[in-house]
């Protein structure tokens, strides 16, 4: 079983160019994190502990003890935290465009992240209003119009209040300490042109995870599975099969 976890501006449809490929060989599942896509909103704060239990219930629903967990950006954060809580449920980890925790990003990137996403929404804008600018800051090659349009659509569909709560929780949640504990095969993938979580950050993560490999995907930014799906699929299937 393979489970795909989207990022902070995404939903399960972000994996539409990947699921059919992996479904040929694996039970393949993509979810909407609580407060995203078709999942319901919730009362109170966004709490990762609740999300980890949600993910465990996905395995239980399909009657699986273990799964290959693939997470992009915040999805990588969830995957890492899930490993800490449920290590025996993880066959392999794939961490895509992943970080140490948003608060550990470059200070200018953190400021840009908050200014472009949180502040406009608090000042009355809707996700669709910020979608074009945010998408252009994440995409590696603006000539890749299909990827850009998919990303704009994804951001436009965000649940505003849930998104704001998720930003707050992600900003204050650290998970770097977990990397040294990971004891399953781990693939790290990152876009060559990713400015939010650059290759240098993924190389640092690789140093901390034993039995890990890294692949830098050319001509891609922060959404490698959307920007370069064929390259992404080929490298991930090679990892999962070997």
What are these regions (language model features)?
Residues 50-67:
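Conserved acidic catalytic loop of the alpha/beta-hydrolase fold
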Residues 220-229, 233:
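Catalytic histidine-centered segment of alpha/beta-hydrolase-like enzymes
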Residues 199, 203-223:
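Catalytic histidine neighborhood in serine/cysteine hydrolases
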Residues 105-111, 124-180:
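Conserved alpha/beta-hydrolase catalytic His-Asp/Glu region
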Residues 182, 188-190, 194:
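Short beta-strand/loop motif that positions the catalytic acidic residue
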Residues 71, 75, 79:
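Gly/Ala-rich beta-loop-alpha elbow adjacent to hydrolase catalytic centers
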Residues 80-85, 91-123:
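Flexible "cap/lid" loop of the alpha/beta hydrolase fold
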């Amino acid at each position: 079983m393979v489970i795909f976890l989207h990022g902070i501006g995404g939903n399960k449809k972000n994996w539409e160019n990947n699921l059919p490929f992996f479904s040929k060989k694996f039970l393949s599942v993509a979810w909407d994190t609580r407060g995203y896509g078709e999942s319901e909103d919730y009362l109170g704060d966004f709490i990762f502990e609740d999300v980890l239990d949600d993910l465990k219930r996905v395995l239980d629903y399909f009657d699986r003890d273990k799964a290959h967990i693939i997470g992009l950006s915040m999805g990588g954060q969830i995957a890492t935290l899930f490993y800490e809580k449920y290590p025996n449920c993880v066959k392999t980890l794939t961490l895509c465009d992943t970080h140490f925790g948003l608060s550990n990003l470059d200070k200018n990137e953190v400021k840009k992240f908050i200014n472009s996403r949180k502040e406009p929404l608090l000042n009355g804008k809707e996700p669709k209003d910020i979608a074009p600018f945010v998408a252009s800051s994440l995409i590696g090659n603006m000539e890749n119009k299909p990827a850009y349009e998919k990303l704009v659509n994804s951001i436009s569909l965000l649940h505003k209040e849930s998104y704001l709560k998720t930003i707050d929780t992600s900003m204050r949640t650290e998970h770097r300490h977990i990397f040294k504990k990971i004891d399953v095969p781990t693939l790290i993938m990152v876009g060559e042109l990713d400015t939010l979580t650059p290759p240098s950050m993924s190389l640092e993560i690789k140093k901390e995870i034993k039995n890990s490999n890294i692949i830098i995907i050319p001509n891609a930014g922060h959404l490698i599975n959307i920007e370069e799906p064929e390259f992404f699929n080929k490298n991930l299937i090679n990892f999962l099969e070997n």
